[in-house]
Amino acid sequence: FATVDCSDYPKPVCPLDYMPLCGSDSKTYSNKCNFCNAVVESSGTLTLRHFGKC
């Protein structure tokens, strides 16, 4: 299954680039930075379902 390396996160500011990822919460995150910030906030409970929109 797909994984994303979030070891460099959280970051205070995310770039605006659009490369969507689908989280295990069925939410589409606009890019890796936004997704990884959410992963850190969830204490690791949020995982990547797949690349692309949910």
UniProtKB/Swiss-Prot annotation:
User: Which cysteine residues pair off into disulfide bonds?
Assistant: 6-36, 14-33, 22-54
Q: Source organism's superkingdom?
A: Eukaryota
Q: Which GO terms describe its cellular component?
A: extracellular region
Keyword Signal (UniProt): no
Signal peptide range: none
What are the entry keywords? Disulfide bond, Protease inhibitor, Repeat, Secreted, Serine protease inhibitor
Domain Kazal-like: where? 4-54
Q: Where is this site: Reactive bond 3?
A: 16-17
Q: Where in the cell is it found?
A: Secreted
- Can you name this protein? Ovomucoid
